[in-house]
């Protein structure tokens, strides 16, 4: 189980080295990179209190669910869902009995990494041809290529998948395929297969707020595509700190109190 260890903020030198490495590896062409693209940069965390004038956002505060309605599952998907033993939510079991992959230090994957139950933040950086996301949870890094490339014809399945993006006005549209089937979509065990096709529409609706609409299309697990809506808030002055994964750490739940009293 992952335990959040509060450490000193990442040093400026480390960030500079990482950024330089990324810039050096950026490949041409960059013809679709818009120099005037909307600015998504900053440290973000899922919002705990959507604004009064916002439509209903469907991520549960405690259990880290992606949606508050059960999506239309296929028999295969229903079987996977019923076999899941989450340690949160109405179907929750003790951690020692859970088969949630993250309790064994597996990466949560996308989209679940956005909504991990302790509310850990992520940072967005934009460089020519790419949008980079640094997640505090287990220090995962996600690259979204915006240089006009298409998905590779030979993708090695992974936890984060293969992501390409384009700008539609003020919205970054991210298309991701190439997932493995070793993760859940959320903390309550919503399943997916290696056929998952995820589309995210990321939009900064104000200086302090950003929305992400997730379209889940997985014909093996669900009878039709479905959408979940999530709201994120800017955290000025926050830094991404060190997080390590410790297998079967029963003290994991205590990190919520740390976040409430500290960050």
How does the language model describe each region?
Residues 4, 15-16:
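Classical secretory targeting signals
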Residues 2-3, 9-10, 21-263:
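PEST-like low-complexity, intrinsically disordered acidic/proline/serine-rich tracts
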């Amino acid at each position: 189980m992952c335990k959040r260890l509060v450490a000193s903020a990442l040093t400026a030198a480390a960030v500079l080295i990482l950024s330089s490495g990324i810039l050096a590896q950026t490949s041409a062409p960059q013809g679709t990179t818009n120099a005037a693209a909307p600015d998504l940069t900053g440290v973000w965390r899922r919002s705990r209190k959507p604004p009064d004038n916002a439509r209903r956002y469907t991520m549960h505060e405690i259990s880290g669910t992606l949606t508050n309605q059960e999506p239309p599952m296929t028999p295969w998907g229903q079987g996977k869902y019923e076999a899941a033993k989450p340690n949160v939510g109405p179907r929750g079991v003790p951690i020692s009995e859970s088969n949630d992959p993250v309790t064994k230090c597996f990466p949560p994957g996308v989209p679940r990494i956005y909504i991990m139950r302790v509310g850990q933040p992520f940072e967005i950086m934009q460089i020519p041809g790419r949008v980079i996301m640094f997640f505090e949870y287990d220090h995962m890094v996600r690259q979204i290529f915006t240089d006009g490339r298409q998905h590779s014809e030979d993708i090695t399945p992974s936890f984060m998948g293969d992501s390409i993006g384009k700008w539609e006005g003020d919205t970054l549209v991210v298309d991701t395929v190439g997932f493995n089937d070793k993760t859940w979509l959320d903390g309550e065990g919503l399943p997916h297969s290696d056929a998952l096709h995820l589309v995210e529409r990321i939009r900064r609706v104000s200086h302090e707020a950003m929305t992400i609409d997730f379209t889940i299309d997985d014909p093996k697990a669900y009878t039709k595509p479905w959408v979940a809506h999530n709201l994120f808030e800017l955290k000025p002055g926050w830094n991404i700190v060190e997080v390590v994964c410790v297998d079967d750490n029963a003290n994991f739940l205590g990190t919520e109190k740390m976040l409430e009293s500290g960050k």
